[in-house]
């Protein structure tokens, strides 16, 4: 597909600086731009590339002011990154989608699957499954008995949904993700551990995306709940009975222990860990590798392990880096004090 700068600006409600008739048919990074491609500048850290890029069109924020001439045509918008996402979604939606059921797929007789869905080779859809419209189940995906799936969902290869779980509308489960496996529940019995049956389920609300090899465990009796708009990166672990609030995002290798309640609009950097049974307020930000062992009662940014307020962490880090010098100074002070004591004792 090919679009002119004029068409793109019209779609994005943007303005043009340059040739409105220049056309593009692909995307590129700003530092690797080629003629016929569109790129963007959202982070001014990369602003120096805009003067050398060979891309034909660059999306920029309305407040961007060039410091020297630019060869590319600029399309100015309110938010360049959000505008790029809109264009990428437009291209994605224009792609033809597979439909129908491949010959080696299995769909149980009691399952209800809309005629406009795609079910790939060796995919499995169990008894009593109810699947909405326009879903895509790629080869080797598994949807267990009595699972309910909304409209416009995508299950990539080897995505697994255990029995009785509920998936909302517009959800994406990437390859190897597992929804509804048993929670890590064992009762000590002498020197061994006895398994506690996990009889609950997982509820995934609308517009949730689950990354590759991410796991969300079923609850003991009720539901593990991932609320609307949550985005989980690859290799995230959500334990049983957890509740994750709306529009919270988690980067790779985050681990949430059992019965944690996470608020709305929280942000988790990579490898953050939360201890079990704690509550997190709305709008909390966790820096990478933060270790959280107690409730977070108000919106804040936390760093470190155990996690503390970001400003205090930065001050502590600055002091930590100076510890060798402080240690040497302290040693010198101690020696001087001892010398003074000796001189005083002589008097």
From Swiss-Prot:
A Pfam family reported for this protein in Swiss-Prot or TrEMBL: Hexapep
Keywords linked to the UniProt accession: Acyltransferase, Lipid A biosynthesis, Lipid biosynthesis, Lipid metabolism, Repeat, Transferase
One Gene Ontology term, aspect cellular component: membrane
Pathway annotation from the record: Bacterial outer membrane biogenesis; LPS lipid A biosynthesis
InterPro entries documented for this protein: Hexapep, LpxD, Trimer_LpxA-like_sf, UDP_GlcNAc_AcTrfase_non-rep
EC class name: transferase
Function comment: Catalyzes the N-acylation of UDP-3-O-acylglucosamine using 3-hydroxyacyl-ACP as the acyl donor. Is involved in the biosynthesis of lipid A, a phosphorylated glycolipid that anchors the lipopolysaccharide to the outer membrane of the cell.
Protein name, UniProt field: UDP-3-O-acylglucosamine N-acyltransferase
